[in-house]
């Protein structure tokens, strides 16, 4: 706990030192430029002060935005904020050290250059110490368990072929018989039966090989013909019962018109012809 407080205090100290150094550089550069004697040094000090103020000011802007707007963990804004906290400590140390060298190489006025250069060195050393802090590894977010329905009876691995190849359904675990079992229903449909067979052993590998569609269609046709054959005898039996009733028998020698129905006018015609 104490170590965490130390690192937090050091971080805020570095930020405040950076802002103070930028303010001193801008002030000294402005005064040097107003005197008009060393304009090149004045531009250098002003450029350095503005650069440091931009680098240090972004941290405070990020803190202000974090207070006004809540960033959800894992979002892009939250990752950018964490990166702004940790990125550039060692890089700032190197940059401040290099910027301070130019201040000591051309000491026009002791207080004009020595004070900004010294502040750059102190700020760089503070950032170097801050870079030794270990980064906190973000804890991986655990996704909530998704609701998933799994059939407790068995697991299915199916391999399907294309064209006229076979289709194999492999069941790695024996499943229980039951009217509501999806696999029993599928098996009964594939085999063309209504009542599935009782499995003899458990924890065995069972494969159901399906033949091509043509052969399956032939099997269905044969099954239909069997049913027809079973139905036809009942029809023939019914016809036989109806034929067993007494019927009038007739012979081939029986005349079509009975004798009693022969016309009586034929003898009279024959008699008239003779006379």
From Swiss-Prot:
What membrane topology term does the record carry?
A: Multi-pass membrane protein
The residue ranges flagged as biased composition, category Acidic residues, are 240-250
Chief localization: membrane
**Bias-annotated ranges (Low complexity):** 153-162
Task: Please state where this protein is localized.
Answer: Membrane
- Presence of the UniProt keyword Endoplasmic reticulum in the record: no
**One GO term describing the cellular component:** membrane
Supply the alphabetized keyword list: Membrane, Transmembrane, Transmembrane helix
**InterPro entries hit by this protein:** TMEM72
Q: Which Pfam families match?
A: TMEM72
TM ranges = 16-36, 41-61, 85-105, 108-128
User: Where is the region Disordered?
Assistant: 139-162, 235-264
Q: What is this protein called?
A: Transmembrane protein 72
Gene coding for it: Tmem72
């Amino acid at each position: 706990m104490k170590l965490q407080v130390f690192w937090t205090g050091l971080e805020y100290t570095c930020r405040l030192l950076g802002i103070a150094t930028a303010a001193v550089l801008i002030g000294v550069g402005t005064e040097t430029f107003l005197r008009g004697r060393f304009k090149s040094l004045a531009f250098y000090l002003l450029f350095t002060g503005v650069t440091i103020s931009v680098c240090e000011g972004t941290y405070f802007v990020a803190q202000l935005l974090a207070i006004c707007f809540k960033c959800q963990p894992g979002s892009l804004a939250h990752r950018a904020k964490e990166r702004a906290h940790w990125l550039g400590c060692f890089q700032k140390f190197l940059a401040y050290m290099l910027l301070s060298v130019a201040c000591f190489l051309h000491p026009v006025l002791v207080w004009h250059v020595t004070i900004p250069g010294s502040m750059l060195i102190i700020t760089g050393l503070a950032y170097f110490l801050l870079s030794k802090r270990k980064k906190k590894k973000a804890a991986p977010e655990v996704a909530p368990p998704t609701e998933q329905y799994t059939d407790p009876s068995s697991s299915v691995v199916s391999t399907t072929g294309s064209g006229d190849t076979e289709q194999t359904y492999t069941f790695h675990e024996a499943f229980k018989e039951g009217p509501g079992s999806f696999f029993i229903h599928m098996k009964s449909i594939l085999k063309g039966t209504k009542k599935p067979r009782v499995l003899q052993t458990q924890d065995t590998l069972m494969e159901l090989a399906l033949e091509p569609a043509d052969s399956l269609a032939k099997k269905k046709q044969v099954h239909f013909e069997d049913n027809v054959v079973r139905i036809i005898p009942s029809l023939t039996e019914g016809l036989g019962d109806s034929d067993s009733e007494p019927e009038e028998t007739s012979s081939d020698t029986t005349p079509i018109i009975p004798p009693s129905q022969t016309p009586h006018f034929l003898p009279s015609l024959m008699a008239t012809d003779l006379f």
